[in-house]
């Protein structure tokens, strides 16, 4: 499948001129196809840059929201991590880009019986499944928020994942791994698509 090269984050920051408090604490940036973007800070605050108005706005977030983010392929949902928790938070997105209705939705597995391992980055595929870098490996969640598979690695916890086309690349313990999948990545800068429902089962 064809791969769209992601926008340069440094170019975006220089062009959009975020508030100083945001620029100095950026954790995750989700560039969108129209030049807008969601940006999280290390404290879990979420900001939205509107490419039409050139305005930065701080978004509503629930208590204890974390800095990791991913956007659903239809661009109608934004998912974030939750601090010291195995939950992920799902927000609805209004047409103007603002967030509302935040609630716990995805739940990750954890064999350590504590929540001291921070959730890593995450990305969706075109089927609406969410891939999350965790201490146990890459946890794959379905549309209903349930973990359906865990890809574990011999080197242990996953530090970061990269999903490009039909290949997933994994950084773990100073080593890099790759695996070809029977699905395709959908990153934030890709055009939104309709996703077939997996049902309630």
Task: Label each residue range with its predicted role.
Residues 1, 53-55, 85, 95, ...:
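Short coil turn/linker residues within repeat-based beta-strand modules
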Residues 9-43, 61-77, 108-133, 155-166, ...:
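Beta-rich, blade/repeat-based domains predominating
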Residues 41-43, 82-83, 93, 135, ...:
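Short loop/turn segments immediately following the C-termini of beta-strands
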Residues 47-48, 89, 139-140, 177:
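WD40 beta-propeller blade core
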Residues 84-112, 117:
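Anionic-ligand binding region
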Residues 135-159:
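A conserved acidic, glycine/proline-rich C-terminal tail/linker
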């Amino acid at each position: 499948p064809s791969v769209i090269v992601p926008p340069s984050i440094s170019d975006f920051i220089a062009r959009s001129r975020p508030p100083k408090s945001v620029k100095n604490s950026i954790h995750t940036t989700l560039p969108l196809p129209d030049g807008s973007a969601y940006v999280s800070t290390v404290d879990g605050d979420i900001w939205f840059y509107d490419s039409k108005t050139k305005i930065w706005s701080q978004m509503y977030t629930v208590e204890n929201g974390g800095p990791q983010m991913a956007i659903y392929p239809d661009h109608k949902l934004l998912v974030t991590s939750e601090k010291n928790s195995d939950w992920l938070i799902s927000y609805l997105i209004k047409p103007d880009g603002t967030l509302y209705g935040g609630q716990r939705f995805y739940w990750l597995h954890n064999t350590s019986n504590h929540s001291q391992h921070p959730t890593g980055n995450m990305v969706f595929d075109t089927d609406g499944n969410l891939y999350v870098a965790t201490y146990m490996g890459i946890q794959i969640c379905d549309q209903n928020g349930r973990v359906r598979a865990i890809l574990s690695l011999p080197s242990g916890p996953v530090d970061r994942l990269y999903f490009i086309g039909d290949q997933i690349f994994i950084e773990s313990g100073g080593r890099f791994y790759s695996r070809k999948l029977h699905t395709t990545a959908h990153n934030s800068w890709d055009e939104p698509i309709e996703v077939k429902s997996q049902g309630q089962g």
